[in-house]
């Protein structure tokens, strides 16, 4: 697609040699788009836009393509006609017109000016419908999949409440293998041949009785 766009000249790569606008009358030509000028309305006010394109091989001849509501639509019409009349030698207003605009049939170019004008109008209308169409079902499905992936890491509030610290409070029997704290440390001290700590020194009402008391003396 990039190679296809690079094969065409655009108004951005080859700007006009002279400033847009007539010298004897007020400026009506579009400052950027090729083949587009304003029709009616004061400069800066809302108006309609007309488009015309030069006919190859006929010096001074121009093909009238019609009147359009926006300058962009008129510029697209110019590109469609230029592609039909000049092929890869066309200078486009938009680089993507080479692949986004519906092609004008070769039979239309052979039918003369009216055939080209009618085919260009059909191409511009089809392009506008395509641009205004909603996203395809495949894109919608992909977006839904992304939302599901994002929601996987979100923990519901109801589930989070289950992990309250109080719900997992363990008693001494579970901590010390079915024994109370005193019996557990007495058994441990006997295995290590050391004096066990004083009974009741470890837990009192579920909390440490004294944080500065040594575990046991050697």
Swiss-Prot record:
GO terms for molecular function: DNA binding; DNA-binding transcription factor activity. Keywords: Activator, DNA-binding, Nucleus, Stress response, Transcription, Transcription regulation. It comes from the Eukaryota. It holds the Pfam family AP2. The keyword Nuclease does not apply. Its main location: nucleus. The keyword Lipid biosynthesis does not apply. InterPro entries: AP2/ERF_dom, AP2/ERF_dom_sf, DNA-bd_dom_sf, DRE1A-I. It is found in: Nucleus. Residues 1-26, 131-151 are annotated as: Disordered. Induction: By cold stress. Residues 32-95 bind DNA. GO terms for cellular component: nucleus. Transmembrane segments: none annotated. Belongs to the AP2/ERF transcription factor family. ERF subfamily. Transcriptional activator that binds specifically to the DNA sequence 5'-[AG]CCGAC-3'. Binding to the C-repeat/DRE element mediates high salinity- and dehydration-inducible transcription. Confers resistance to high salt, cold and drought stress. This is Dehydration-responsive element-binding protein 1B. It comes from Oryza sativa subsp. japonica. The lineage of its organism: Eukaryota, Viridiplantae, Streptophyta, Embryophyta, Tracheophyta. The gene is DREB1B.
């Amino acid at each position: 697609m990039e190679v296809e766009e690079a094969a065409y000249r655009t108004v951005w790569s080859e700007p006009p040699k002279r400033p847009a606008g007539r010298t004897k009358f007020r400026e009506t030509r579009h400052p950027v788009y090729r083949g587009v000028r304003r029709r009616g309305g004061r400069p800066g006010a809302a108006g309609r836009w007309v488009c015309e394109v030069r006919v190859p091989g006929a010096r001074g001849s121009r093909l009238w393509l019609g009147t359009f509501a926006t300058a962009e639509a008129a510029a697209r019409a110019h590109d469609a006609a230029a592609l039909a009349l000049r092929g890869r030698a066309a200078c486009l207003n938009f680089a993507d017109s080479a692949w986004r605009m519906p092609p004008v049939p070769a039979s239309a170019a052979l039918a003369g000016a009216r055939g080209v004008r009618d085919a260009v109008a059909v191409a511009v209308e089809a392009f506008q419908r395509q641009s205004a169409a909603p996203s395809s079902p495949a894109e919608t499905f992909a977006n839904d999949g992304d939302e599901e992936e994002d929601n996987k890491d979100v923990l519901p509030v109801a589930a989070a409440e289950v992990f309250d610290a109080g719900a997992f409070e363990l008693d001494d029997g579970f901590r010390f293998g079915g024994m109370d704290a005193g019996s557990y440390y007495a058994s441990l001290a006997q295995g290590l041949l050391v004096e066990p700590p004083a009974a009741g020194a470890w837990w009192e009402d579920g909390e440490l009785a004294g944080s500065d008391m040594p575990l046991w003396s050697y």
